[in-house]
Curated annotation (Swiss-Prot):
Substrate binds at residues 10-17, 23-24, 62, 89-92, 100, 116-117, 187-188. Catalyzes the interconversion of 2-phosphoglycerate and 3-phosphoglyceratea crucial step in glycolysis, by using 2,3-bisphosphoglycerate. Also catalyzes the interconversion of (2R)-2,3-bisphosphoglycerate and (2R)-3-phospho-glyceroyl phosphate. Belongs to the phosphoglycerate mutase family. BPG-dependent PGAM subfamily. GO terms for molecular function: bisphosphoglycerate mutase activity; hydrolase activity; phosphoglycerate mutase activity. It comes from the Eukaryota. InterPro entries: His_Pase_superF_clade-1 (IPR013078), His_PPase_superfam (IPR029033), PG/BPGM_mutase_AS (IPR001345), Phosphogly_mut1 (IPR005952). This is Phosphoglycerate mutase 1. Acetylated at Lys-253, Lys-253 and Lys-254 under high glucose condition. Acetylation increases catalytic activity. Under glucose restriction SIRT1 levels dramatically increase and it deacetylates the enzyme. The record marks 186 as: Transition state stabilizer. It comes from Pongo abelii. HAMAP family: PGAM_GpmA. It is an enzyme of class 5 (isomerase). The modification N6-succinyllysine is found at residue 251.
Length: 254
């Protein structure tokens, strides 16, 4: 018997997803299609009768706007929202802004897959001469981060290492209080939570593709452990196509 329910949603397609570019900590907004994805995700939650007590998101507008769109659809815009850099997307370092297919053609699909999907291999760091270095590293939303906390690049392992303390210290206590929690975040910060919840191996998390804009539902026991695998709110065809699209992102164009 489930003691709690948790809903995760990956932000809708961003303008840089649309251009197939590595976004990372660059603050790309939703594309028009991404806004529609978020709207459909919200409508799926509304149709299923979901209500929430508290929401968590990153400090990046594609996740925040997805959350706003969902809350609008379910008519719960008044809910408290906690924003944290710890739920940000993985920092793609020197790859930030590069087209994924062009990068695959240059470095090989295998190398790009390692950078995108490996557990502990970071991409090349973002150097001070990178075109988006000041845009990210000097942004005042990160002014309170220590030098150790502000990354120049991250592996998935690094992303999980900064997301999990927030999960354990801030989100889990809310779940255990019986609060109905909604998390709107990013592919890699959410994969970190999923890996932790399901006890997935490093190899399994490498192959996990989370679709954009589709609510992911977990039923949890009293210890905040899943009693069954994640469920997607949406028709099977929509979910399958979305997951395939995510998997195809790092492949060179034929």
């Amino acid at each position: 018997m489930a003691a709690y329910k948790l809903v995760l949603i990956r932000h809708g397609e961003s303008a840089w997803n649309l251009e197939n570019r590595f976004s990372g900590w660059y603050d790309a907004d939703l594309s028009p299609a991404g806004h529609e994805e978020a709207k459909r995700g919200g409508q799926a939650l509304r149709d299923a009768g979901y209500e929430f007590d508290i929401c968590f998101t990153s400090v990046q507008k594609r996740a925040i706007r997805t959350l706003w769109t969902v809350l609008d659809a379910i008519d719960q815009m008044w809910l408290p929202v906690v924003r944290t850099w710890r739920l940000n997307e993985r920092h793609y370092g020197g790859l930030t802004g590069l087209n994924k297919a062009e990068t695959a053609a240059k470095h090989g699909e295998a190398q790009v897959k390692i950078w995108r999907r490996s557990y502990d291999v970071p991409p090349p760091p973002m150097e001070p001469d990178h075109p988006f270095y000041s845009n990210i590293s000097k942004d005042r939303r990160y002014a309170d981060l220590t030098e150790d906390q502000l990354p120049s690049c991250e592996s998935l392992k690094d992303t999980i290492a900064r997301a999990l303390p927030f999960w354990n210290e801030e989100i889990v206590p809310q779940i255990k209080e019986g609060k109905r929690v909604l998390i709107a975040a990013h592919g890699n910060s959410l994969r970190g939570i999923v890996k932790h919840l399901e006890g997935l191996s490093e190899e399994a998390i490498m192959e996990l593709n989370l679709p954009t804009g589709i609510p992911i539902v977990y039923e949890l026991d009293k210890n905040s452990k899943p009693i069954k695998p994640m469920q997607f709110l949406g028709d099977e065809e929509t979910v399958r196509k979305a997951m395939e699209a995510v998997a195809a992102q790092g492949k060179a164009k034929k």
